[in-house]
Amino acid sequence: MTLEKNKDSFTNIIDLSLINKEQKVTFTPTKEIYTELLKKRLLTIALLVFIIKIGMAIPLPYIDQTKLLNNATSMFDLSGPGLAAVSARASQKIGLFTLGITPSINASIILQLAFVINPNLKKLQREEGESGRRKLIKYTRYLTLLLAITQSVFLIFSLRAFIFEWSILKLFELSCVLSSGAMIILWISECITKTGITNGSSFLIFLNIVSVLPEQIGMSFKNLDIFSFEGLIVILTFSITVWAAIFLQQTLYIIPLKNPKLGQNELTKKLVEDSLYLPFRLNQAGVMPVVFASYLIPILKTGGIYILLKINSFNLFPFLIKFPEVVNQSLESIVEAGLICLFALFYSGLIIDPKDVADELQKSGFFIFAIRPGEKTRNYLEKIFKELSLIGALILAFNVVLLNLVGFVFNLSIFKGFSIGSQIILLGVVTEILQKVQALVLNDVYKRIRDRNK
């Protein structure tokens, strides 16, 4: 994280209210505000989404889709915890794009974890600039292909009962088709990112959540009276978790910066100092802690059941295997909350290294008021960063536990598909799109004004 990147991401977003009266008169019509460049980018994204829909509608050959649909009440969770472009849960069909963005997401996670183990990768990410970034993209693509092939083989092998005349050759063919679909999704994701409107991977996850949300809401509230006590509890829970998602996503801790070389007079100095700050989010790790915990909980649960069955076979603690469901759910929620806190603290450390930030500040000639550059700055940033990460982790964990318990008590499936992670993704993507569109519009407005005044 460099100072310039930090500063640009927040100071370049200008509010439309800053346009003066003359500019508003000139560019009032809506058709003028939505510029040609913006229209092209939005149309590009719409076309790419249409391609995804077509790909999902193309069924895989050799598979008895009718038989598969009849046995799909407990469909394979192909996308992990909601991380696919459009999952099989939404389409109820095994199609070309069934794997979605999952292999790419998993590849990115694995590479980020590898940065901790391999210092050369960390150096490649931080010090080699554009060439290093291109190498990392290439590594991500290779790893995505490897994961897509692996996931395809396991998926097709698990569906062998629904495949006409099962053979190893058909396993190879279908795996190639699914892997190709995953790589096409990766290409679409990169194309969406290049439009500058939003991050491609996040947008595809956003599409997945939105595609299944209406059905989940309808099923969950079908037998629930929203004016009853249970309905009020559900509405209150939604309000709390949505507020928490907004708070985690939008709250910034601002550290003002000083630079003695900038600003020669009082007015210039004041303007410069007001625009210099180091922003830290409460939730630097985003939804990754929830994703990690979602992957790990089923493994721990399966292992725990196996151990309990082994213990029960010796009749040592027979009461353990007869725990009521509410106790099991409570223990699972507590373990998940603990894992989320651990992963949030760990993953936040991967995203921002206070030592690197302190070094970058010192090289750029910036310092924090009343804090000496170097070691003192690093210690101060570490302290602030740990406190913010802990607060964000606790809020994240509390909301996950709250949604799990309320969903379990009132038997609401919507809380599984509309978790705090989903809310953060939805809010983050919508906010990013609005900010990027606003910035593009203002950039074009000021460009026209500048050209007109020449």
From Swiss-Prot:
Signal peptide: none annotated. The gene is secY. The central subunit of the protein translocation channel SecYE. Consists of two halves formed by TMs 1-5 and 6-10. These two domains form a lateral gate at the front which open onto the bilayer between TMs 2 and 7, and are clamped together by SecE at the back. The channel is closed by both a pore ring composed of hydrophobic SecY resides and a short helix (helix 2A) on the extracellular side of the membrane which forms a plug. It comes from Heterosigma akashiwo (strain NIES-293 / 8280G21-1). InterPro entries: SecY, SecY/SEC61-alpha, SecY_dom_sf. Component of the plastid Sec protein translocase complex, which is composed of at least SecY and SecE. It is found in: Plastid, Chloroplast thylakoid membrane. Keywords: Chloroplast, Membrane, Plastid, Protein transport, Thylakoid, Translocation, Transmembrane, Transmembrane helix, Transport. The chain crosses the membrane at residues 43-63, 97-117, 144-164, 168-188, 201-221, 226-246, 289-309, 334-354, 390-410, 414-434. Belongs to the SecY/SEC61-alpha family. It is a multi-pass membrane protein. One of its GO terms (cellular component) is chloroplast thylakoid membrane. Its main location: plastid. This is Protein translocase subunit SecY. The lineage of its organism: Eukaryota, Sar, Stramenopiles, Ochrophyta, Raphidophyceae. One of its GO terms (biological process) is intracellular protein transmembrane transport.
